[in-house]
């Protein structure tokens, strides 16, 4: 399936970490998971939204540009509750994260609906194969018992009244109890940790990457914003249906996007569960089927029964970039320490060669 898209698949190593946090009761704490019925396993994933946010953060960092300002609307109800409203983004492609990430603004008294679909289609980061990933559980403790003079203990009785030091001491002696400066956190409140080989996929729509529609039937921009962008150097295509980003800005964003695609990292939810999540291999092509076959897993029944084996394959129509760390997981491969640098340079050349005006 060849289209005017650039397809990127990445293979990453994940070790004892947390991706997305999940809201809910204590039995749904700390990690988003899904069930793989064919292999009867629950596996963790990093949501497409988190991957997208991480890539756009890397792009903004490479550009040394702050992300577009967002207004978070709140409504104070009659009973004193603060209710969430729709966040307002500026809907302005002048910001790289808006141009690449898209926007949506619902109809209001001041404006009509405007919506831009992102030219980046981004998958969740999920296991290369359910048998090549897993979850580990652990409990935790919040411990200050090494310095009891510095840390106090407050005890209240059944009525909620704070007990005096004498009352606490009497209770401890009469009941043969201790009062440690320690809080035990069971594993069902800590949540599982993910490990294994993970993949992500990105499709870059080259037809829409640097163009914004001027169509007012399904508007991406209002007329005032179209006029403002033209004054800032954006040009109309020959048919007048799209605005095209200025060449100088295109070149800067291409460099930053290539960096984001090759060097993005999950930066949230890892204060106690940091994993470098190194990229082991990247596959790049204009054909989605080729990148998914270049980095894949094969089933084998040799030895201990059904197992999955990671495969890195090279063939016509796909460029594969393999780092030395990949040799710890895949046999029979050729790796280079500068492979990701080469991938970044090739992505830059690919994006520069595309035609963005029609």
What residue ranges belong to the model's regions?
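Short, conserved phosphate/pyrophosphate- and ester-handling motifs at nucleotide-, phospho-/glycolipid
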Residues: 48
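Basic polyanion-binding and macromolecular-assembly surfaces
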Residues: 1-45, 56-358
